[in-house]
Amino acid sequence: MSDDAVKQMKQVVAKAAADRVQSGMVVGLGTGSTTAFVIQFLGDRLRKGELSNIVGVPTSFQASVLAKKYGIPLVTLDDVEKLDIAIDGADEVDPAKNLIKGGGAAHTREKIVDSLAEQFLVVVDSSKLVQKLGSTFPVPVEVLPFAVAPVTRALKALGGEPELRMGVKKDGPVVTDQGNFVLDVRFDDIPDPAELEKAINNIPGVVENGLFVNVADVILVGEIVDGQPQVREIFH
């Protein structure tokens, strides 16, 4: 599939998500390429007067920068107890609406923000749909730098193949917004995502992992049908 087709899918699904936000809402702003379009479209709606009195809770420095660029007022979790909606992307979505997230190394903040939302809305293009989690994407695990070696051993004992995520435009490991490292862990099979999510988080030194199980309310999928981008909704 061409880059242009993927961009079209991301834009159409992002607009559909932004259109669900109503005036007065507290909105969780996710991280990633598709969610970046959501933030842009929310800014467009504010500028046109279609929306008013919304505030955003960013899940990352990237989301914060984009929200400021497009004129979305921001608050922190010190200011709000709950959110009306959180909109976020995913790296994989299985038929049970379970997710792998964390390609942008923001999954810890995303999981916190998404858990506080009345509705957690996930936006993806069709390439992110898989039959089983772990098919194409490793499970990201945020880990304290001090604990990388013991956590690596513990993840191997769970059947994983951990690899320290390295920077692309800088030498050395990727550092999260919290100042931690990320281990990308491949598993041959994830028969029970809920159990694996708990098992990983029980390892001392792990901050959070990218398995999001039984938390997504609605998945919006951007896809190309007969040459045209359109949106499909999954909510069962």
Swiss-Prot record:
Subunit comment for this entry? Homodimer.
Q: EC number(s)?
A: 5.3.1.6
SUPFAM superfamilies per the UniProt record, alphabetical = D-ribose-5-phosphate isomerase (RpiA), lid domain (SSF75445), NagB/RpiA/CoA transferase-like (SSF100950)
What is this enzyme's catalytic activity, as reactions?
A: aldehydo-D-ribose 5-phosphate = D-ribulose 5-phosphate
> Which branch of life, at top level?
Bacteria
Which HAMAP family does the entry link to? Rib_5P_isom_A
Location of the active site: 110
Molecular-function GO terms, alphabetical: ribose-5-phosphate isomerase activity
* Pfam families named in the record: Rib_5-P_isom_A
Role played: Catalyzes the reversible conversion of ribose-5-phosphate to ribulose 5-phosphate.
GO term, biological process aspect, one? D-ribose metabolic process
- Record's keyword terms, sorted: Isomerase
**Pathway note:** Carbohydrate degradation; pentose phosphate pathway; D-ribose 5-phosphate from D-ribulose 5-phosphate (non-oxidative stage): step 1/1
Q: Name one GO cellular component term.
A: cytosol
Native species of this protein? Thermosynechococcus vestitus (strain NIES-2133 / IAM M-273 / BP-1)
Task: Specify which residues bind substrate according to the UniProt entry for this protein.
Answer: 31-34, 88-91, 101-104, 128
The molecule here is called: Ribose-5-phosphate isomerase A
Give the protein family.
Belongs to the ribose 5-phosphate isomerase family.
